[in-house]
Each structure stands twice: as structure tokens, then as C-alpha cells.
Amino acid sequence: VLLFVAALTSIVQFSGLLQSAHRRWVVAGLVLWIQLIVLMAYFLRAHIVASQADVIATTRGFYGVLNVSESDAGTDDHLRTLSHGRICHGNQYMANAYRDWAGTYYSVKSGVGVLFNHHPERVFKRPMNIGVVGLGVGTIASWARPGDHIRFYEINAQVAKLAQRYFSYLKDCEGDVSVLLGDGRITLERQLAAGENQEFDALFIDAFSGDSIPVHLLTREAFELYFQHLKADGVLMVHITNLHLDLSGPIRAVAQSTGKHTLLIEHEPEGWAERYSRWVVVTSNEDLIY
């Protein structure tokens, strides 16, 4: 309706021109202009409807708006994705044959896959104790095996609710899985103060993909805290995939100041459900890196 009114207004404004010698050309131009606007409006509406049709859940809270969207429902390619603005926080194929597949930043050739395929505890088929700061949709839980223990630390309760309701990584985890709500560093500090050293074989820090960087997780004191919760040969994995910042330099500097060895693992996606990823491996176990 608004477009039609705008078109009529334009016709009135140009009515004086209709008396000129170029009347036919003016009329033809106006008709073409109106058709172009109507066509653009049609495609814009179609785009808006299509983009909204895939969103199956939306939550708004202190940390912003979270959306769960899906595509190809009812097929083997049925995919659900958790996003915060432009940032993807994980996805999952929902068909039974593929739902345990780790995508986005956690695929076989990502830093996560490399770690689990080469960690001594996994190589010798011993149970692993795993910590993860930042839940996402719980994709890392798909890497757990029977006998493993995996504990997630998540600051946003809404993320935990969406991960548990719309994704199955936590429910389908082969190991024992738990989710602790609250700031990851503060929770780790409280555990240490209570004498609850977690003795992790691997600790993943997965909280830096958004626009706002939780700097308190990147300090020397934070890294010292992480390694107090890791076994002597344990591995710290820091996810630094970010659209705006390259955190590899600061992380390497902090790690080296604490006498640790580092390795940057970058992975280019090989499938459409994978994402480009960058992980920094930090460890005292020199043999694991070299």
C-alpha cells in the first residue's frame, strides 16, 4: 500500500511533464519505475519471510539475542544452528545417522580433532577428564568416550537451556557430562579454593568467538589457574577463531611467560557444516607438540 501511494505521489509530481512533447517517454518511465519498485518489494518480502521461517527459537537476555535456526527439516541434511548475531556457536545434524558428527570449529581436522586423536590418554584408550569453558551447543561432548568425564562451564543460562532443548550432544554423550553455570574463571577459582582440583587431561577455553572478549580469561593469572587444574602433562586448548581480532600473539606471550609450549592449529572447512577455525595448543608436554 505504501509503495502504491508513493507511486501515485510521484505521478502527481510529474503531472506537469505529461503535457510536454515527451509525454509518452515520461509515462513509460513512470510505469517502469513503479514495476521496479513493486518487484524489489516482492523479493525483499520473500527474503524476510524465508530468513524468519528457519528460526525455531529466540531468546533475549543480558548477553544479547540468541537464535536457533534449522534447514532441510525432514531430510538427512536437517541441520540446526545456534547463533548470536553473525556469530555461530555450533550446529548439529539432526538425522540419527549424523547427529554425533562434530561440525563447525570442532571437526576431525580442527584443533579439537587433532587433540583427541593424538592425546596419550586417547591413544592408549584410557579415560579422559575434560573441562570446557564455554558450552555452545555442546559439540565437544561428541568427542567423549565411555569412561570419560566432561565438565562444561557456561556463563549464560539461556545457552545451556537451548543446548539441552534443541540439540542432543549433551544427552547423547558417551561419557559422564555436567554443566556448571556461572563465570568460568570464578568457578574454577572457587573449586581450587575448596580443594577441588579438577585434574583435567585437557581444558578447552572456548569463549572468544564473539564481539566482546572476556579479557579476564586471557591474563597470566588465568593461565596459572588453568594449569593448576590440569595434570602435569595436561593440555590447554584455546579457541581463537574471531572475525575481528587475532589473539594468537597475546596467548603465546602469556603462555611463554609461564614456561609453556604453544602450537597454532588452523583448519580450512572441507564441508559446508564446518567452519574455519584457529586453536592454540598450550602445554608443558613438549613431546605432544614436537
Task: Give the positions of each predicted feature.
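Alpha-helical transmembrane segments of multi-pass membrane proteins
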Residues: 1-290
